[in-house]
Amino acid sequence: EGAESVATDETNLVVRAMNRGFTAMNATPPGFILKCRNAIPHGRGLGSSASAAVGGLIMSRSLVEGGENLLTDSEVLNIALEFENHPDNLSAALYGGFNVSWLVSSGTGAPDTADAVQPTVHPDLVPIVLIPPHGLATSKARGVLSQQVDRSAACHNLSRTGLLVYAMSQD
């Protein structure tokens, strides 16, 4: 999926994430040939960029002896923010399943950090994924959204978010 639009050199997102992972672990990458199978459609809102960033970091970790101790999942999540600033997509790619994620501001001007939890979901719930037939860049899709949200709509949506998380765990 998307092979015609994916870079095949050092600018490839998976390669950049792998190199960043090696740097974070202070490790030298071994020689390797990378072949990717892109099963997540690009430009459809399913998190292909987040998956590429997380996948690259996890691959670098797996190629370094003791990498699991040198690069924790939390560090993977936060390094991946350098490539994809959507912790919801990143946490889904890293942990799988249902996630609630958020950005935490340091208040000091340092980059935001991300955190995530994986609430228990009732086992009878089955996810449904709808894939649009045509792609659209995330920046363009978000560009058509209003910069302001009505206060009552925001409050309503916030209350329903908590309700959704609760409801997904109930019989």
Language model feature labels by segment:
Residues 1-8, 38-47, 80-87, 147-152:
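A short glycine/serine-rich beta->alpha loop
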Residues 11-18, 53, 127, 138, ...:
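A general structural signal for well-ordered alpha-helical segments in protein cores
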Residues 1-44, 62-70, 106:
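ATP-binding N-lobe of GHMP and related small-molecule kinases
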Residues 8-12, 46-54, 155:
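Short, conserved micro-motifs enriched in small and acidic residues
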